[in-house]
Amino acid sequence: MNTDLQDYSHKRLNILTGEWVMVSPFRANRPWQGKSEAVTNGRRPAHDESCYLCAGNTRINGEQNPKYKDIFVFTNDFPALQKDSAPFISKDGLLEAQGEQGICKVICFSPYHSRSLADMQPIEIGKVVSAWQREYKELGDMDGINYVQIFENKGSVMGCSNPHPHGQIWSQSSLPNEVIKKDQHQLQYFKENSRTILGDYIVQELVHKERIIFENHFFVVLIPFWAIWPFEAMIVPKIAQKDILELSDFEVALFAEAIAVLTQAYDKLFNCSFPYSSGIHQAPTGGENNDHWHWHMSFYPPLLRSATVKKFMVGYEMFGSPQRDITAEYAATQLKNLID
C-alpha cells in the first residue's frame, strides 16, 4: 500500500462480509481507568469431582460420563436448538417468526480438567480435529441440517460456564447470519474470478508478510487486515478447500500444529490463560455446489493491553461500526515474536 496506515485514522474492508472496521492507531496509549478483569492463573486439578465434564462424573441430568481417555462428544443437556422442534412460518404484518431445528453437541478436548488447547500436544489436538470432521460429516448428512457450526468459548470473560477444555457443535436447518454474509461475498468473487477470495488474499499476504504470525506447508496463521478484536487471528489453508472433510491425515496434523502454535503464543502474550472465542466457517451441508467456499478458523480474543484490560464492543461500535486502536500489523509482530 502507498499510505503508511500506522499514522492515520482509517477504515479497512472485510472482504468476507463487505463490512468496514475503523482503525485509530494514535489511541493505543490512551489512559485507562475503566474495568479490569480478574486474573485466574492458579492451576486447576487434573480431575474435579464437581465438574460436569470430567471423565466418570455425573452430569446435571443424571447421566454419567464414561471414563474417556482423549475425546468425549455428547448431545448438549441444555441445547439451544431441538431436532424435533416443529417447522413453521408465522407472519403478522411486519412481525415474522420461523421455526428452527437443530442438534447441539459438546466436545470435551481432553479428560484433564487442568488443560486447554495451548497445553496439549499437536497429536492430541489432531484427535480433536478428527472428531470435528466426524461430527461435521455425521450431522451434515442428516435430513433438515444445512449448517454445522464448530466453536469454542475459552475463559469466563467469554461466557464459558465450565473451565474444563471443551467446545460446542451446533447444527441447524438454516444458515446463520455471519455465514450468509460470507457465503454471498465468496460466491460473488468466485463468479467473477473463478478463484476463491481467500485463496487470492493469502497469496497477497504471503508477499507482504507483515500480518503473518506462522506458516507451515499447508496453513497460514495471520492477523487479518480487517481484524476487529485486538489480537484476532485466522488460520487458513493455502489451497482452497470447502470444508474440513477435505483435509488429509497429514493436513490434519498441520492444522493441529497451527492451532498449537497460535494458542501457545496467546498464553505467552500477557502470561495468562488467554481467553477467546474461536470457530470454523466452512461450506453449508445442504448439498449445494460450494466451490466458492474456502474454509477458515477464526479466533476472537478480547484482551487489549494486559491480562486485566479487555476491549469492549460498546458505544460507537454498537451504533456505528467496529473500531480498533492497535493495528493488525502491530498485533502480528507481538505474537510472532513469541513463537519459538
Residue ranges and their predicted role:
Residues 278-282:
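Acidic/histidine-rich, metal-coordinating catalytic segments
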